[in-house]
């Protein structure tokens, strides 16, 4: 009688199950339509313009600010990342800033252009925010980024033609309402 070799073959093969998700590449939404020009040594706050549209329907887990081609050590994220602060900026802080918003399934980024000018070379026409309101109708003027710097005991100064003929009501949130 001969002995037959017995080979045991497993019925089940062990293979570790690893679930992987493909993280999508960030969608580049391009450059924001408004450029920011600020004075040297005055705090700068850059807003994340997409926060209002994204927060309505998306669960944003992370917001990251970067400066293209430079270290990010001068960037301070405020308001849960929806704004970026630079204290005492210099002209070397001028450049393209990128903010990246991500959640579990989505990633997009947009860039903002920041130019820091010295006080000696500044021109108020470049830094002012011209807005036109028809004097025959109620209008609302919005001063960009003013909420970050305004306090309740600050008087607002307005300059313009026939400004005395209008009633000005401060809505206490950085908005002024002009009534004929």
Curated annotation (Swiss-Prot):
It is found in: Secreted. The keyword 4Fe-4S does not apply. Transmembrane segments: none annotated. Residues 1-20 form the signal peptide. GO terms for molecular function: interleukin-1 binding; interleukin-1 receptor activity. SUPFAM superfamilies: Immunoglobulin. One of its GO terms (biological process) is symbiont-mediated perturbation of host process. GO terms for cellular component: extracellular region. Coiled coil: none annotated. Keywords: Glycoprotein, Host-virus interaction, Immunoglobulin domain, Repeat, Secreted, Signal, Viral immunoevasion. Glycans are attached at residues 80, 103, 113. Belongs to the interleukin-1 receptor family. May reduce the host inflammatory response by interacting with inteleukin-1 beta (Il1b) and thus decreasing the association between IL1B and its cellular receptor. Interacts with mouse Il1b. This is Interleukin-1-binding protein. It comes from Monkeypox virus. The gene is OPG201.
